[in-house]
């Protein structure tokens, strides 16, 4: 899901991971025409993506619905995803296991092109279905 140009996908494949890459729009990598938010089939694995921020909550909730207990949802999100009353109910489920905060501001590419610097703080958020403890915060 949200495969985009395949930058994350290609790196994961290079590292030896078994990857299923989809996106709503085909951009030269993976399978296009797949609306992740309409998926119903349980996925036996972990889900990793960089979702559109305005739909991030919906992507996290859908991903947690689609995986088995013990599997993970890993999302590259703005650090400010931690804020907000609407997202609070998601965090109350206690399935957020780790947040890896980037020590250095990350530059995000649009269509594979990096432009300028970033004023936005990002983090990798890791949920584990069935995890019932406080989340851990780490820096990378």
PLM regions and their residue ranges:
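Class I S-adenosyl-L-methionine-dependent methyltransferase catalytic core
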Residues: 1-140
């Amino acid at each position: 899901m949200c495969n985009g140009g395949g930058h994350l996908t290609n790196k994961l494949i290079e590292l030896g991971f078994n990857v299923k890459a989809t996106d709503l729009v085909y951009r030269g990598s993976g399978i296009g025409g797949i609306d992740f938010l309409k998926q119903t089939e349980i996925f036996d694995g972990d889900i990793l993506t960089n979702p559109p921020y305005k739909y991030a909550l919906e992507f996290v909730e859908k991903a947690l619905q689609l995986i088995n207990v013990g599997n993970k949802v890993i999302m590259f999100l703005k650090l400010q995803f931690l804020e907000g009353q609407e997202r609070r109910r998601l965090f109350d489920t206690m399935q957020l296991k780790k947040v890896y905060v980037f020590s250095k501001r990350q530059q995000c590419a649009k269509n594979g092109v990096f432009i300028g610097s970033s004023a936005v703080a990002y983090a990798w958020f890791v949920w584990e279905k069935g995890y019932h403890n406080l989340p851990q915060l780490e820096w990378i």
